[in-house]
Amino acid sequence: MDSTNLNKRPLLQYSLSSLGSQITKWSSSRPTSPVRKARSTENDFLSKQDTSSILPSINDDGGEQWYEKFKPNCLEQVAIHKRKLKDVQEALDAMFLPNAKHRILLLSGPSGCSKSTVIKELSKILVPKYRQNSNGTSFRSTPNEHKVTEFRGDCIVNDLPQMESFSEFLKGARYLVMSNLSLILIEDLPNVFHIDTRRRFQQLILQWLYSSEPLLPPLVICITECEIPENDNNYRKFGIDYTFSAETIMNKEILMHPRLKRIKFNPINSTLLKKHLKFICVQNMKMLKEKNKWNKRQEVIDYIAQETGDIRSAITTLQFWATSSGSLPISTRESTISYFHAIGKVIHGSHSTNNDNEMINNLFENSNNLLSKEDFKLGILENYNTFNKGEFSISDASSIVDCLSECDNMNGLPESNEYGLREVRKTFRNISKQGHNHGTVYFPREWKVRKLQNSFKVQAEDWLNVSLYKYNAVHSFRNITLEFGYYAPLIRKCQSYKKKYILYYLKNLPSGSSGPKQTMDKFSDIMKVENGIDVVDRIGGPIEALSVEDGLAPLMDNDSNNCDHLEDQKKERDRRLRMLIDQYERNVMMANDDLEDEETSFNDDPIVDSDSDNSNNIGNETFGRSDEDESLCEILSQRQPRKAPVISESLSDSDLEIL
């Protein structure tokens, strides 16, 4: 056996038990220049890889997946745009400095767009650059030092729950600085679909951002964003159950924090995909020629590059085609079309095809009924002016708006959506376009209006419960909307302020004075106001304008338009209602007790005739009548009734003269 092999340390994977993470080992003998060659032919690329012996030979296949076999081993091999690579490298490089502006780098984008790959390759360059060994001496060989500490969601530490393991991971990661410097990578997130787990995850991220420690290792979070198709996906709902993105996982406080840097990734363009797929075909030239597929490689590569922007899916599809014995149809991984992507295709068209009808048909087939929803037409209305930076005639804009209006009038017909989208695409296709700048895509403001309406209804129900159970007053929803929704909380707020200074005044009165009781009686209405019960803020929130926002920013967790915030309002309404019902029942019970006390005291104190001399026989009398009165009445009843003389009621002449 060669002596060099005996002295060579085996490549093993270590895991820090206190962190619950997987440590990936990297080789230090790698080029460090991030600059990529402008162009290179297939033969030049092949000879370069053969001379450097970076990639394994095709003879030791052994059934290995190609996306693992041909994964990048240096920064130059990563499929990423030069400008995006520069942005990530500059942001990550600045995070290693002592007084770094950012503590967390958030990379978000679709699957297979080289998010985590570029971070791992950059760590090979930046971690050794900034790592400080104690006393300038390295006690371990450089190739085996950990450059990336990655959180593993399936790794349980000391039988702790998942979030406790994640918390312990972050606590231990704080010490990976100076001579132990390592880049912290979080790609495998905890179960953020569970609301309590998601909130705990957000709290831990905020603790990292607000930490008072002057020196922390760089923390990189990679989020693979996607649309989650559901049969009951309703356009009126938005949340992590339907859209897995940074906006639904994080909250607004995290995403807007000054110590967090976010970089959005796009799907890999067809040029980069073709370059890497060609290189893989060259590496497997022998096998492709044996299967008589070498001459068809370019056609297959072009098809795969147009169908997907996921490099892992593209490589897997190429491997399936190359290793199959027969000529099977090529199909890439099913990719959902996002809301903004579909809007961009309708307004700006598609680069993959010039046939607009075919493009619209593909959208209807692959969009999971997204194009049939009302929000999509509103998105077209909100963003049609972004075409060519708004430089088109007013007649074209009028025809687009008229088309969408006609589509609304035919809303009951299934063909209405197709008519509207095809007419819009036809109008834009006939407009001369300058350049390829599509501008920013905005989310329709109608979504905010609907969410604010739902929030207003919940708050109105809450105020109505207080008015009914506490003040015994009932109001219609119309009156709440027009009058009470604004003025009633304002009055209660003023009364609450008056109650505070009245209590302060009573507190400072001298003891023994009669002022407190008189003041409490005089201002009894004001003293009824309770901050935990009464609504003192305007129903629906403060009055403000609705502005358009790009992306999914208006739908974040702690935004007033989000469904999670609406659920919190419902919980607050139910909590207040339970308190009101309990208080109302206590008041009713107290009133019933007082009424029973009055009835009991009345029965114990009967009415006595003070004129009666025989007070001892009062119990034998009936309604104040004695036995003698009874006998007298019996005697009188046996006598014949007397006849009174008839008196003429008419007046004589003399009587009239006297009058």
From Swiss-Prot:
Subcellular location, record wording: Nucleus
GO annotation (BP), single: reciprocal meiotic recombination
Pfam families in alphabetical order: Rad17
Xref: InterPro entries: Checkpoint_prot_Rad17_Rad24, P-loop_NTPase, Rad17/Rad24_fun/met, RFC_lid
Compositionally biased tracts (Acidic residues): 596-612
CC annotations in GO: nucleus; Rad17 RFC-like complex
Cysteine disulfide partners in this protein: none
Record: residues binding ATP: 109-116
GO MF annotation terms: ATP binding; chromatin binding; DNA clamp loader activity
Keyword Chaperone attached: no
Miscellaneous field: Present with 752 molecules/cell in log phase SD medium.
Family: Belongs to the rad17/RAD24 family.
Name of the protein this chain belongs to: Checkpoint protein RAD24
